[in-house]
A protein has these predicted regions:
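Short S/T/G/P-rich N-terminal loop/turn motif that feeds into the first structured element of a domain
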Residues: 19-248
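Sec-dependent N-terminal signal peptides
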Residues: 6-11
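Positively charged n-region of N-terminal signal peptides that target proteins for export
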Residues: 1-4
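N-terminal signal peptide c-region/cleavage motif recognized by signal peptidases
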Residues: 14-17
Length: 248
C-alpha cells in the first residue's frame, strides 16, 4: 500500500511538472558546411518569428557539437495546433519575417554555406518516462541547462512495455539515491533515427558539467544492488548519441 501511495504521489508530481511543457516537438534538421554562419542566420529567423508573431510557439535551435547539423525546433500542445499555426504563419506572417530577414542579411544570406534540409522530425513528450527532481522548476532550469545529450534507443520487438517499466524503475532508484538531474523522454512520431524507438534527452549546464555530474551519479549507482541488477539485465540498445547546445 505504501508503495502504491508513493508511486501515485510521484505520478502527480510528474504530471504537474510536465504540464509546463508542450506535448509535441517538431524539429527540422539541416546540414551545413559553415555551421557558425548558418546557426547565426537561423537564430535571426527564430528571433524574428518570436518578435513578429504574437502566437509564436516555443522556438529554439539545437546545434550539434561534434558535427555540422543544426535543428530548427518548435514545441506545440498538439499537432492540430501546429497545423493551425503553420497555416497562419505561412499565409500572414512569413512574408513579413522574410522581408525583415532579407533586410538584415541580404537576398542570398545562406550562399556559400552549403546548407541543405535533411528531414523533419516529430516527437511526442513522454512525461511518465521523464525525470525532473521534486521541487525543481523545469521552466526556470531549462535556460540554465544549455547542453543536451540525445541518446536514441532501439527496443526489440515486443519489449516496449518492459523498456518503459525498466525506465520507471531506474528513475525511482535515482530518486532513492538522491541523484538530481533532468531527463526528458521523447517518442518519435515521424522521422527520427532508423530503428530509434525512444530518444532520451539528458540536460547539463555544459558538456563538462554534465559528465562531471554523470560520474558522481554512477558512483552511487554502482554501489547500489538494485541498480546493478537493472544494469545487468538491460532492455533496449543505445544506437546513437549526439551532443548539442541549445539556443532559445
Amino acid at each position: 500500500m505504501k508503495k502504491i501511495i508513493i508511486s501515485t504521489f510521484c505520478l502527480l508530481i510528474t504530471l504537474v511538472t510536465f504540464a509546463q511543457l508542450p506535448e509535441y516537438v517538431i524539429s527540422n534538421e539541416w546540414e551545413t558546411s559553415n555551421q557558425q554562419k548558418a546557426e547565426k542566420l537561423m537564430n535571426d529567423w527564430k528571433n524574428l518569428i518570436l518578435e513578429m508573431d504574437e502566437n509564436a510557439p516555443r522556438t529554439f535551435l539545437l546545434t550539434e557539437m561534434d558535427g555540422n547539423s543544426v535543428y530548427f525546433t518548435q514545441a506545440f500542445e498538439s499537432l492540430a495546433k501546429y497545423e493551425a499555426w503553420d497555416k497562419n504563419f505561412n499565409e500572414n506572417v512569413r512574408p513579413k519575417v522574410l522581408a525583415k530577414f532579407r533586410e538584415m542579411n541580404g537576398e542570398n544570406a545562406f550562399e556559400g554555406t552549403n546548407t541543405e534540409f535533411v528531414m523533419g522530425h516529430v516527437f511526442k513528450m513522454r512525461p511518465d518516462l521523464s525525470y525532473v527532481p521534486e521541487g525543481m522548476n523545469l521552466m526556470e532550469e531549462l535556460p540554465k541547462h544549455t547542453y543536451r545529450r540525445h541518446v536514441t534507443v532501439d527496443v526489440g520487438w515486443g519489449e516496449r512495455s518492459a523498456f518503459e517499466e525498466m525506465q520507471k524503475k531506474q528513475i525511482q532508484n535515482d530518486i532513492k539515491l538522491n541523484n538530481k538531474y533532468i531527463t526528458l523522454m521523447l517518442e518519435p512520431v515521424f522521422g527520427g533515427t532508423e530503428r530509434g524507438d525512444y530518444v532520451m534527452v539528458i540536460l547539463g549546464e555544459s558538456r563538462a558539467a554534465y559528465f562531471n555530474g554523470l560520474e558522481e551519479r554512477m558512483k552511487k549507482r554502482n554501489a547500489d544492488n538494485e541498480w546493478k541488477a537493472m544494469r545487468d539485465a538491460p532492455v533496449g540498445t543505445w544506437i546513437e548519441e549526439e551532443s548539442l547546445m541549445i539556443t532559445y
